[in-house]
Amino acid sequence: MTKGMLTQGETVTLKVDEKNRQLTSKNHSATHVLQKALRMVLGSHVEQAGSYVSKDRLRFDFTHFQAMTKEELAKVEEIVNDQIAAALPVVTKETTIDEAKKMGAMALFGEKYGSTVRVVCMGDFSLELCGGTHVSNTAAINCFKIISESGIAAGVRRIEALTSEGLIHYYEKLSADLAEASAVAKTTPDKLTERIETMQGEIKALQSENEKLKNQMAKDAVGNVMDQVVEILSLIHISSPRDRSLSRMP
């Protein structure tokens, strides 16, 4: 419902947005795999500090003391995509909080849970307490790509990532931007980096030449001024009274 009012006793129809739910579930399941991958790469000190999932993207905040390296990010991506390719079954079950802890299920730090909780198990890879929507198999996530990693607070990092259709749209946009940049640089996408490096060299050479010309022009200007000063001083010298009297002597 986007506008209007509901009154008591009115009949309504509820309908799930299947496409939205499907894409959201892919991103949600990806956060579970991501958290386990982060703990494997960075250490067991990593804990979830917040998250956001939508049909377009996912965001995962976690505890860590420094920025991740390119190698660490690449390793995390590799692990997540390996688990997607492994087509792990995703199973949910309700159990007691004590039983879930015995199973080794990860819980959100500071979260209060009731006596009955929902456990989401992804093969032998991930086991977490969660009440959200998920895929039935990790293969449904399709693919995973980290697009940014940044710090948001002391000891808290943030990863933003894409999966499935969101990642496809991202690469389509990159491809279009690359084609446009290549056209401006008068080259092809596969040679754009080489072309940019060549242009940077040309710009550097032009800047150096421009600096030389500016210095030469400054020297020439100073030389011209000095010539004019000498000429003026000569005129002043000749036109002085003593010089005129000397010039009339036999």
Locations of the language-model features?
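Non-catalytic interaction/regulatory segments
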Residues: 45, 55, 62-152
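Conserved nucleotide-binding/hydrolysis modules and their immediate coupling elements
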Residues: 1-14
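Short, hydrophobic beta-strand segments
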Residues: 14-20, 57-66, 161, 233-235, ...
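Active-site palm subdomain of RNA-directed nucleic acid polymerases
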Residues: 37-50
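Histidine-centered catalytic micro-motifs
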Residues: 26-39, 129-137
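Short pre-active-site segment immediately N-terminal to the catalytic Zn-binding motif
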Residues: 20-26
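Single conserved hydrophobic/aromatic residue that forms the stacking wall/gate
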Residues: 236-237, 241-250
